Amino acid sequence: PANLDNLVILMADDIRLEKVAMREKLRGSLDRLIGQNYIGRTGDTYNFLTDEEQDIRERNQLTQVDTGAIVGDIAKIIFGIIYDAKKFRYGKCDFPFDQMVDNTMYGIATGGMRLRFLTAASDATEKTEFRLMNSSKGSEAIVVLGDTPYYESLEASMKIRKYVKQRNVSQMPKSAQDIIRGQQEEAAKYEAEASKALVEAIENAKFYADGEHLDIKSGNAKAKLTRRWSIWSRMFTASWT
């Protein structure tokens, strides 16, 4: 298959070629060709596009999607799949907490403790060290997601889904229906990539609570969140006594 690793091997004219550098250089070139609608990518496989495929893909890319909708999907993945805890335990009691991504509340607000994630869509001023330290002094813990392509993957998927929804696909020529069917499969792969990228973004995130930057180096995404949340909940509840 025409995936990135195989293309690097095909282009190698020297066995001593620095494959990592070539891989990144080639990825950049392929991304530019995708942006110009000359080629497409499904998962890890690249392919040349026909004129009809180029036309449909260009219309896809021109489709506008709402930032709030993308953030809402990020919240569903984080709080619905990756970290689905609804309460934290302190002593013998369970306490509910608010779940938030950027400025979007997920679920019902309780008015108590809050766990908030900042995404690539949030304003840069929200992520300054001073602002993070200051905002996390009260009842809010803040997680600044690491730099992974979760946002771009969800945006690409949403554009495809919205484009298809706006078209009467059953009345299109069979060739166009086949292209759209392939793009729907591509959208599902983008969504899977976004979930994986969000896990990595949490594992590489910065966590702020009680006006401090809490550094937890080991563990997967859920374990890191649980550990950081446990530390902060002890700090927060201790301030009550």
What are these regions (language model features)?
Residues P1-T241:
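Extended alpha-helical scaffold and adjacent linker segments that couple domains
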